[in-house]
Curated annotation (Swiss-Prot):
SUPFAM superfamilies: Initiation factor IF2/eIF5b, domain 3, P-loop containing nucleoside triphosphate hydrolases, Translation proteins. Keywords: Cytoplasm, GTP-binding, Initiation factor, Nucleotide-binding, Protein biosynthesis. It is found in: Cytoplasm. Residues 68-386 are annotated as: Disordered. Residues 478-646 form the tr-type G domain. GTP binds at residues 487-494, 534-538, 588-591. The keyword Metal-binding does not apply. This is Translation initiation factor IF-2. InterPro entries: EF-G-like_DII, EFTu-like_2, IF2_II, IF2_N, P-loop_NTPase, Small_GTP-bd, T_Tr_GTP-bd_dom, TF_IF2_bacterial-like. GO terms for molecular function: GTP binding; GTPase activity; translation initiation factor activity. Residues 534-537 are annotated as: G3. The keyword Protein biosynthesis applies. Gene3D superfamilies: P-loop containing nucleotide triphosphate hydrolases, Translation factors, Translation initiation factor IF- 2, domain 3. The gene is infB.
Length: 979
């Protein structure tokens, strides 16, 4: 195969210099600046293998097939051009000169043999030559087929010989009568281009057929017999023949020069034979090239037959590539119609795929196509990214990021679900909740899943940022138990702790009730230590009790013997059991005359909490905290529970624990009470708690004495945090302050996002609901308190006061004294400032007086709630009721100019006042409602007229009064509404 380097470079889309340089590296002698250098098979294969890697899939194979086809026609094309220029007549010597290239020499000798045998007897010569060609080298095979092709062409006349022997005999016998005469003239032109174009001006095709077919034809003639019998279908060969149009197109310009008349006569005489030729081509499916060449020759010779159609198909494609003469195209158009009928669906699909592949490769082969492809890929990538973002966004919309202890209303807002449905779901799982009650993590998960949401707790997400430390078993030592005292308000929790600690904590609590979580360390006479947590009993402190149960080891549930098991007691028991905390029941106040401990045990048994006295597993002790009865026995039972639990911790590691309370101390800054649960907390440690962080500057115990370190189960008060962490947050000791700051900032960001999610924008539905209610009002509050737990409890209680007509909004809550910024916020939002055990600063008080902002300060949570209730009642619009005071009958009417209609009436019942409102009724229908214009008794004005007397009156803004009308007098009474 001899190919121009430039042609291959154009197909591979590579510079000629690059190809030449590559060949020189491989040891071939190639000129760098000569694009017309011809390369052989070996060089072609190397180049296609090297530079075909970057081509699209299937492109390299297409290029290989293209040049394999061209190799059959290109050598012939060169001589054909010479023939045209020099003349067809007597330039055999010149054509012979072209044979000089070494590649062509073997063909030349073989062709010479063909010529000598041709003029003599065409029929016997193929028989002799076929074995010779088979014995000869592959190049020799190329020459032999030329004659065989001429014989194969007449095979189309085989119709009369449809019997089994038709395959060998028709091919050889039929050419004898017609073709020997025709073949002789054909052979003469072949002799002129002896080198390779043996055949008439069409020489290119014969040569194309010459290269591969001889060996294949030999096989054909042997195999075709069987193939023809087995394969009668005409579809497959046609499709393949169509693919090999390239060869015939080269010779399209020389068609008129060849002896087409003889071929036409054959076609006219034997139309059926042509169809059989199609079958032959199909039988030659194995030898694609030969079939294409044969059909190509016939197509050029024939003007409009069945053979022509197959040849024309071969001509159509090359005609487009090499710009053939218009005559060839016309023939192609004519002949392209019949084959369409025979093409199968598979062929059509394959053709479409090839066409699309060719189009796409053309695009990529140009720089413009590359740019378009790049832009298309970029668009696809952008669309995929947008689709992924939409999927991710839809997932995020169904994922709730929240913290534990979210209220029912906040949860409903985040899910955009009516509050009633959330409450109904909670009731279905056995929980009686209110709109502002806080839910724990487990309940939130259940409710969210019910509505198709996933929950992601912010706290859990951020705890993962801190790698947990694993403790070795040998490093663990026993630690004191953490005991929480829980129960109903005024049942004696703090009194019990006082008795244990020999102090008087109650005197320090406003109103004698506990409003903070107190943490106290206690050393018993036996030397063992216990850490006590005292939780508030008031219903507002639900979250506080939940936190107390979360960090405790043992719970003492205290119940007054002279009272019942109260709601807060039940709630405390539920918190403890939910946390899996063992409980010890202390029945207090047994010194009182009305004490009945057995009734308490019975009520506990009804709740499925059987005490040991009644055969259950829960320990109980009857005590009197005030008089110190049985306190020691209670502590022994607590220590027994602790021994069963085998509480251990590792003091030789960084500390981890929980925030119990946090507050703002004017002299010391933000102060936090923490419970160390594991490890040891030292002075100077970097602490991260919630969104707050800092380095510990000082530590104090519960008696306000400075300490330098705190071990497991030890409560301490720490200074140094940059804010007041939320009660219940976990604190961790980190290595660097930078790490703590980064995590704290991330937590703060998530907390802010949750606040935005919870904030619900007013919708049209809300507006219409408010208009339906009529006088809808909002009460905005700013809550400031001394400790975080109290602020949270108070805020929840105030929000719970909301009604349909008045909505209470806590727009800001914080720890610390009331500052100027609080006053500015209150002025901007028309809010009232509530201070719980805090006072405003001097500047804030002056600012409040200037701006007209009301500041209320309280020390007891009950007082705060009652005051806000009364304020809300004052905001309610009063209820208006009508009270009928009397009725009159119109006896006679008089019309007076400038005054209007005067009615003379008799008071039937009650009395009519000058200030009363009246209603004019005619035939039972109210005609007018308004006020009296005047009321007279004779000629004097009267303030009121009682029953049985006559009077004269006129109605303001109405003169439509008739005899017999009834006038009803009534008063409107405003009745104050209550919550």
């Amino acid at each position: 195969m001899s190919i121009k380097l430039f042609s291959l470079a154009k197909e591979l889309n590579v510079g000629v210099g690059s190809l030449a340089g590559f060949l020189r590296k491989k040891g071939f002698d190639v000129e760098d600046n000569n694009p017309n250098v011809r390369i052989e098979n070996e060089e072609f294969d190397l180049l296609l293998t090297e530079f075909g890697k970057s081509l699209p899939k299937g492109e390299a194979e297409r290029i290989r097939k293209k040049f394999v086809k061209q190799k059959q026609g290109t050598p012939a094309s060169a001589p054909s051009a010479k023939e045209e220029t020099a003349g067809m007549a007597a330039k055999e010597a010149q054509v012979i000169a072209t044979e000089v290239p070494q590649d062509m020499r073997p063909r030349f000798t073989i062709k010479g043999k063909v010529e000598t045998e041709k003029p003599a007897e065409p029929v016997p010569s193929p028989k002799d030559k076929e074995p010779d060609t088979v014995r000869e080298d592959k190049p020799a095979r190329e020459t032999a087929p030329v004659k065989e092709e001429t014989k194969v062409v007449p095979v189309k006349e085989d119709k009369p010989k449809e019997e089994k022997p038709k395959q060998e005999e028709p091919k050889r016998e039929e050419p004898k009568p017609e073709e020997p005469v025709q073949a002789a003239p054909v052979a003469k032109p072949v002799e002129k281009p002896v080198d390779k174009p043996q055949q008439p001006v069409m020489t290119q095709k014969p040569q194309e057929a010459e290269t591969p077919p001889p060996a294949q034809e030999m096989e054909k003639k042997e195999d075709t017999e069987e193939v023809f019998r087995l394969k009668t279908n005409t579809q497959e060969p046609q499709v393949k023949v169509v693919g090999k149009i390239d060869l015939s197109s080269i010779n399209s310009s020389t068609r008129p020069k060849k002896k087409t008349k003889e071929d036409r006569q054959r076609e006219q005489n034997d139309a059926d034979g042509k169809k059989k030729r199609k079958r032959i081509n199909k039988a030659a499916v194995d030898v694609k090239k030969e079939a294409a060449k044969v059909s190509g020759e016939q197509g050029k010779r024939n003007a409009g037959g069945g053979n022509h159609s197959s040849g024309n198909k071969n001509n159509n494609r090359p005609a487009q590539q090499q710009s053939n003469a218009s005559g060839g195209r016309k023939n192609n158009k004519r002949q392209s119609l019949p084959p369409k009928v025979e093409i199968s669906d598979e062929d059509v699909q394959r053709q479409v795929k090839e066409t699309l592949a060719r189009l796409t490769t053309k695009k990529t082969s140009t720089t413009l196509g590359r740019g378009a492809k790049y832009r298309k890929d970029k668009r696809d990538a952008a669309s995929r990214a947008a689709q992924d973002a939409m999927e991710l966004n839809s997932e995020e919309q169904h994922t709730l990021k929240l913290t534990e202890f979210v209220t029912v209303s906040d949860l409903s807002n985040m899910m955009d679900v009516p509050v009633n449905e959330v409450i109904a779901t909670c009731m279905s799982i056995g929980m009686m909740v209110g709109i502002n009650q806080r839910l724990d993590a487990e309940t939130i998960n259940i409710v969210a899943e019910e509505f198709g949401f996933k929950t992601e707790f912010v706290s859990a997400d951020l705890v993962e940022a801190i790698a947990p430390e694993e403790d070795n078993e040998e490093d663990l030592v026993a630690r004191p138990p953490i005991v929480t005292v829980m129960g109903h308000v005024d049942h004696g929790k703090t009194s019990l702790l006082d008795r244990i600690r020999n102090t008087n904590v109650i005197e320090g609590e406003a109103g004698g009730i506990t409003q903070h979580i107190g943490a106290y360390g206690l050393k018993l006479p036996s030397g063992r230590r216990i850490t006590f947590l005292d939780t508030p009993g008031h219903e507002a402190f639900t979250a506080m009790r939940a936190r107390g149960a979360k960090i405790t080891d043992i719970a003492i549930i205290i119940v007054a013997a002279d009272d019942d098991v109260m709601p807060q007691t039940v709630e405390a028991i539920n918190h403890a059991s939910a946390a899996g905390v063992p409980m010890v029941f202390a029945i207090n106040k047994i010194d009182k005359p009305a004490a009945n401990p057995e009734r308490i045990k019975e009520q506990l048994a009804n709740m499925n909490y059987l005490v040991e006295d009644w055969g259950g597993k829960y320990q109980s002790q009857e005590i009197s905290a005030k008089k110190g009865i049985n306190i020691t026995e209670l502590l022994e039972k607590v220590l027994l529970e602790a021994d069963i639990l085998e509480l251990k911790a590792n003091p030789n590691r960084r500390a981890i624990g929980s925030i119990i309370e946090s507050s703002l101390d004017k002299g010391r800054g933000y102060v936090s009470t923490v419970m160390v649960q594991n490890g040891t907390l030292n002075m100077g440690d970097v602490v991260l708690a919630g969104t707050c962080h800092g380095r510990i500057k000082a530590m104090f115990n519960e008696r306000n004495q400075r300490v330098k370190q705190a071990g497991p189960s030890e409560p301490v008060l720490i200074l140094g945090l940059n804010g007041a962490p939320a009660a219940g947050d976990t604190f961790n000791v980190l290595e660097t302050e930078q790490e703590a700051r980064e995590i704290a900032n991330r937590r703060e960001q998530l907390q802010r996002e949750q606040g935005l999610r919870t904030h619900k924008i007013l919708t049209l539905e809300d507006i219409s609901r408010r208009r339906a209610i009529g006088n809808f009002q909002e009460l905005n509050l700013i809550v400031k308190g001394d400790v975080d737990g109290s602020v949270e409890a108070l805020s929840d209680s105030l929000i719970r006061l909301s009604t349909e007509e008045i909505q209470v909004n806590v727009i800001h809550k914080a720890v610390g004294q009331i500052s100027e910024s609080d006053v500015v916020l209150a002025a901007a939002s028309s809010a009232i400032i509530i201070g719980f055990q805090v006072r405003p600063s001097v500047a804030a008080r002056k600012q409040a007086e200037t701006d007209g902002v009301e500041i209320r300060t309280y020390s007891i949570i009950y007082d705060t709630i009652e005051d806000i209730k009364s304020a809300m009642e004052g905001m309610l619009s009063p209820e208006i009721r009508e009270e009928v005071t009397g009725s009159l009958e119109v006896l006679q009417t008089f019309k007076i100019s400038k005054v209007g209609t005067i009615a003379g009436c008799m008071v039937k019942e009650g009395k009519v006042k000058r200030t009363s409102k009246v209603r004019l009724i005619r035939d039972g229908i109210v005609i007018h409602t308004g006020e009296l214009g005047s009321l007279k008794r004779f000629k004097d004005d009267a303030k009121e007229v009682v029953a049985g007397l006559e009077c004269g009156l006129n109605l303001a803004h109405s003169n439509d009064i008739q005899d017999g009308d009834i006038i009803e007098a009534f008063d409107e009474i405003e009745i104050k509404k209550t919550l």
